[in-house]
């Protein structure tokens, strides 16, 4: 599977929309993802043997709901899918009505 397919597969069991870059639907909980960086490594014959994709996976939910279990479940799902153990940034948006969790992790492709 490609990196984006691995993200979608990891998030699918949670029953929330999961799309690249921008979600335009009406769900209260959803995931978007983007490539923060990608680079070659393990060079041989002037070509990379491996590409490392640094990803940001964004989970949005109502700010008035507890986020701890969501954070643990999503982090574990990404790690179990082969990503590095995600660092998580938690913030609120839209006048503190939306919680935005950013999971930052990498995977080799």
Protein language model annotation of sequence segments:
Residues 1, 6, 43-49, 86, ...:
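Compositionally biased, intrinsically disordered low-complexity segments enriched in polar/Pro/Gly
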Residues 72-109:
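Acidic-leaning, charged glycine-interspersed low-complexity segments
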Residues 51-63, 99-108:
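Oligomerization/assembly interface segments of phage tail-like spikes and tubes
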């Amino acid at each position: 599977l490609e990196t984006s397919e691995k993200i979608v597969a990891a998030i699918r069991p949670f029953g929330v929309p999961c799309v690249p870059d921008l979600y335009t639907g009406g769900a209260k909980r959803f995931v978007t993802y983007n490539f923060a960086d990608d680079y070659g490594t393990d060079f041989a014959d002037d070509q990379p043997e491996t590409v490392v994709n640094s990803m940001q996976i964004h989970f949005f939910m109502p700010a008035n709901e507890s986020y701890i279990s969501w954070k643990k479940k999503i982090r574990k799902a990404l790690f179990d899918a082969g990503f590095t153990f995600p660092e998580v940034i938690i913030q609120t948006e839209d006048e503190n009505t939306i919680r935005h969790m950013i999971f930052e992790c990498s995977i080799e492709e």
